[in-house]
Amino acid sequence: MSNSAKSPSGPVGDEGRRNYPMSAHTLVTQEQVWAATAKCAKKIAEDYRSFKLTTDNPLYLLCVLKGSFIFTADLARFLADEGVPVKVEFICASSYGTGVETSGQVRMLLDVRDSVENRHILIVEDIVDSAITLQYLMRFMLAKKPASLKTVVLLDKPSGRKVEVLVDYPVITIPHAFVIGYGMDYAESYRELRDICVLKKEYYEKPESKV
């Protein structure tokens, strides 16, 4: 008996995998993301054990909006499985407009609400390509005098670097490609896709939008 069903993303087949018309191919499945994130969470838990984290002195996960919101939620749960107390804060900065190339100019759109002075901060990014935004955020947060500051990145694209930045916890390294899904978008679309997919060039190279 088939378990096929209809969804806004298209038909779901017997393997539960959606067919994405805008996708050239699936780069990383949701299950692969979970496995890699769980492994990363174990490493983070080991590294922070000496910090004596508690509910009063938690690890602050600084979710960089909008792309890392799903990754942050999953990471928080995997860290909880490892016994790491966390608190989630949100920040938003961007060097992208609606295109696929960085503008090189970072705009701060949302700052953290609480003081993070003397707190342990882990910046959570969905993807690092040029590293311009991450470099900006690290400098911005260091000015707030945290007790420690590290970075975790779901997708690391070293080939796209324009500035040198240390990524403490790169979860998955990928080649140069424009990716969507699992929180990541093109022109605010496709964040809801379960898998991480390579966007077809025709969707962002033609003047007429297919979004």
UniProtKB/Swiss-Prot annotation:
GO terms for biological process: GMP salvage; guanine salvage; hypoxanthine metabolic process; IMP salvage; purine ribonucleoside salvage. GMP binds at residues 66, 125-133, 157, 185. It holds the Pfam family Pribosyltran. Its cofactor is Mg(2+). InterPro entries: HGPRT, Hxn_phspho_trans, PRibTrfase_dom, PRTase-like. The active site is at 129 (proton acceptor). It catalyses: IMP + diphosphate = hypoxanthine + 5-phospho-alpha-D-ribose 1-diphosphate; GMP + diphosphate = guanine + 5-phospho-alpha-D-ribose 1-diphosphate. Its EC number is 2.4.2.8. The keyword Cell division does not apply. Converts guanine to guanosine monophosphate, and hypoxanthine to inosine monophosphate. Transfers the 5-phosphoribosyl group from 5-phosphoribosylpyrophosphate onto the purine. Plays a central role in the generation of purine nucleotides through the purine salvage pathway. This is Hypoxanthine-guanine phosphoribosyltransferase. It comes from Leishmania donovani. The lineage of its organism: Eukaryota, Discoba, Euglenozoa, Kinetoplastea, Metakinetoplastina.
